[in-house]
Swiss-Prot record:
Binds 1 Fe(2+) ion per subunit. It holds the Pfam family JmjC_2. This is Bifunctional lysine-specific demethylase and histidyl-hydroxylase NO66. Residues 100-116, 136-156 have a biased composition (Polar residues). Residues 1-174 are annotated as: Disordered. PANTHER family: MINA53 MYC INDUCED NUCLEAR ANTIGEN, RIBOSOMAL OXYGENASE 1. It catalyses: N(6),N(6)-dimethyl-L-lysyl(36)-[histone H3] + 2 2-oxoglutarate + 2 O2 = L-lysyl(36)-[histone H3] + 2 formaldehyde + 2 succinate + 2 CO2. Residues 347-483 form the JmjC domain. SUPFAM superfamilies: Clavaminate synthase-like. It comes from the Eukaryota. InterPro entries: JmjC_dom (IPR003347), NO66-like (IPR039994), RIOX1/NO66-like_C_WH (IPR049043). Its EC number is 1.14.11.-, 1.14.11.27.
Length: 687
């Protein structure tokens, strides 16, 4: 392999047209539409100058811990890695996970990323809803607040405001690290507790309504598998770098709904009926959000009304949004709360790392964006009208109590959320329950719901939302245009002109006429439609279009300490007194690599062009940037396809498909690693 400081990575070497054999240019989906790819989306795979980044990492959005020096080896070292569980990364925050591409630039309401309209938001969005399109806005430090008038005494909550670490990737702007709550992968998202299942409540309805109760240790074991056992803490495996991210997401969901098993949930409740997990212990979700965390979030970040926070009320059957203009600072927010208004935080995962970690884990299992909204409601208040949503909702009660009434759907599995409904439209509730701290409530899309706090308690809850626009209908919307387009090329009858008298026989004005000629035309069109049968390849390409949507919407991955020392995000660069830069890593033919996450990339073919989409570079806002992708030659695609099928196992570079020569293959794999797409099995030793 050539000199490390002189070698240029394969992806970085070709920055012009994608027509040459080795061209692997990174582009944007809408470059033709915009005339040229946006500058901030043309981030090269190796560095902005086409080669490796030389020089020490900057502090403006780059990883800057000078003590992180545990890196670099050829990867061929056969050292036993069983000590990883106790192997600190020479950092005082060894349990901290790092979030990629925070892009901490202050948001402006006038920019497209901050406009009120969103693919998934409506003015009549209501409390159980977490429109997945809610903007995920980046954060900017604004210093300490000298005063924060509060209407209620804040409960104590864990607070460890550390500087956020962002990784050495090209940033949109020079930014300053932001103080946020830092999550430890060794801290449980759920409190340990023993659990059992109660029999379902008797309902005058043949729909299965679940009631699952967790009890103190020593309680009776229920019929549900796993009852009487302690809920597993959401702790990482000792071999975090060897785990399958889909299985991690599945395990996380299983712990949320325990003691109900995943099999029971998917068979009896998923997209079918609601259920509640009732706990007898409090504090199950208290490390995800609290009054104190909200207060610190408002102080430390530029959070705006309408973009990031809504102030709402519901009185006398009328729902109102009472948002002021501008930034939402603590005195203003708490004053609204004291007057009886509900506070909805639209993108808390942009600011709260532990909540973001939960969403990131679940999105791998659901293969779609998992959003989060936070709702804070004062005593004896209701912030939203009855309504139904177009998402699968998981309500996590954090503080206080809230009464929920759930009504049977008027339309099963709707594709869009409802407007505000009146009380006269509801009928009798199927469920009428009070959620307490640690309780969880699930209800499918289409189930009407409303919630109100009781006289003696406020409420703080999180709504996780998933599976928005993930139906067969969405797949068919992508598929049928492909079928029509390709069928036209193969079927002469589809290319023939319409009859000259078709306007006089078809259309709404002619619907009552049942003449023979009209019926003949209708029959002919129906026969043509029956020829439009999708091929296997068309179905694959349509599904890839849905997968591109996920790549665009997904939250960037959070990086555990064990992963940090195996990825580019923990790499260090040093320079001597003469300014000569050296890196602390080097890949070799014997280095074993794998994808960072199961769904981190998606290979697609569009108009004969092979592309690889990835979400490592996504921002924390919803669709802040154009989709990230680079274009490939077939032999590049074969390498990525091999890595996809090998996941979660590691593959040595020398065992990947050949690519011209070994040097080309090594440079290509190294370019993927430098983009944050790959992880090595063994931590690098110092060179």
């Amino acid at each position: 392999m050539s000199d490390k400081n002189k070698k240029v990575s394969a992806f970085a070497a070709y920055r012009g047209s994608a027509t040459s054999k080795n061209d692997v240019q990174k582009g944007t989906k809408n470059s033709d539409k915009n005339g040229a790819a946006k500058n901030n989306n043309n981030r090269n795979l190796a560095s902005k100058n086409g080669g490796k980044q030389k020089g020490p990492p900057k502090k403006n959005g780059s990883y800057s811990d000078g003590d992180n020096g545990s890196s670099s080896s050829s990867g061929e070292d056969e050292e036993d890695d069983s000590t990883d569980s106790s192997d600190e990364y020479e950092s005082s925050e060894s349990g901290e996970e790092y979030t990629l591409n925070s892009h901490s630039s202050q948001s402006s309401p006038e920019t497209p990323a901050n406009t009120r309209e969103s693919l998934k938001r409506r003015n009549d969005e209501a409390e159980g809803s977490n429109p997945i399109g809610a903007k995920r806005t980046s954060s900017t430090p604004v210093g300490q607040s000298t005063s924060a008038a509060r209407s209620t005494q804040q409960p104590k909550a864990p607070s460890c405001p550390l500087q956020r670490r962002s990784c050495p990737l090209p940033s949109k702007k020079n930014t300053v690290p932001v103080k946020v709550e830092v999550a430890s992968p060794d801290r449980a998202l759920l409190s340990p507790q023993s659990i059992k299942k109660e029999p379902g409540a008797s309902m005058l309805c043949r729909i299965k309504i679940g009631l699952v109760k967790s009890v103190q240790p020593g309680g009776d074991a229920g019929a549900e598998a796993g009852a009487g056992q302690a809920v597993n803490r959401l702790e990482p495996c000792h071999k975090v770098h060897k785990e399958n991210s889909i299985e991690v997401g599945k395990r996380t969901l299983a712990q949320l709904i325990a003691p109900m098993t995943m099999a029971t949930f998917l068979r009896d409740h998923w997209e079918k009926s609601p259920f509640r997990v009732k706990t007898t212990t409090s504090g199950g979700f208290s490390n995800l959000i609290s009054f104190k965390m909200i207060d610190q979030m408002l102080i430390q970040n530029h959070v705006e009304y309408t973009t990031n926070i809504d102030v709402t009320s519901y009185e006398d059957g009328v729902r109102k949004t009472l948002n002021p203009d501008g930034r939402a600072l603590p005195p203003s927010v708490w004053a609204h709360y004291q007057r009886g208004c509900s506070i909805r935080i639209l993108n808390p995962s942009s600011y709260l790392v532990q909540l973001r970690q939960l969403c990131v884990k679940l999105q791998e299992f659901f293969h779609c964006l998992v959003g989060a909204n936070v709702y804070l409601t004062p005593p004896e208040s209701q912030g939203f009208a009855p309504h139904y949503d177009d998402i699968e909702a998981f309500v996590l009660q954090v503080e206080g109590k809230k009464r929920w009434r759930i009504y049977a759907p008027t339309k099963e599995l709707p594709r869009e959320s409802s407007g505000n409904l009146s009380q006269t439209e509801l009928g009798d509730p199927i469920m009428d329950i009070v959620l307490k701290p640690g309780d969880l409530l699930y209800f499918p899309r289409g189930w009407i719901h409303q919630a109100i706090t009781e006289k003696d308690s406020h409420s703080l809850h999180i709504t996780l939302s998933a599976y928005q626009q993930q139906s067969y209908a969405n797949l068919m919307e992508k598929l049928m245009p492909l079928v029509v387009k390709e069928s036209v090329e193969q079927t002469l009858k589809l290319r023939k002109g319409l009859p000259l008298d078709i306007f006089q026989n078809l259309g709404v004005a002619n619907a009552e006429w049942k003449g023979a000629h009209r019926q003949k035309l209708i029959q002919h069109i129906q026969n043509l439609a029956q020829r439009l049968v999708p091929t296997e390849g068309q179905i694959d390409r349509a599904l890839d279009q849905l997968a591109i949507k996920f790549q665009h919407e997904a939250l960037p991955p959070t990086i555990a300490p064990q992963e940090l020392k195996r990825t580019v995000f923990g790499a260090q660069a040093t320079a001597d007194r003469n300014g000569h830069c050296s890196l602390d890593y080097e890949l070799a033919e014997g280095t074993a690599v794998r994808l960072l996450r199961a769904n981190i990339v998606r290979l697609t073919v569009d108009e004969g062009v092979l592309r690889c989409y990835y979400y490592t570079d996504n921002g924390l806002e919803y669709c802040k940037y154009e989709p990230n992708f680079f274009e490939l030659e077939p032999f590049h695609g074969t390498v990525i396809e091999t890595l996809i099928h090998a996941y979660p196992e590691y593959t040595k570079i020398k065992d990947l498909p050949p690519m011209g020569n070994d040097e080309d293959r090594l440079e290509f794999v190294e370019a993927l690693w430098e983009r944050g797409i790959l992880m090595v099995e063994k931590p690098f030793k110092k060179l």
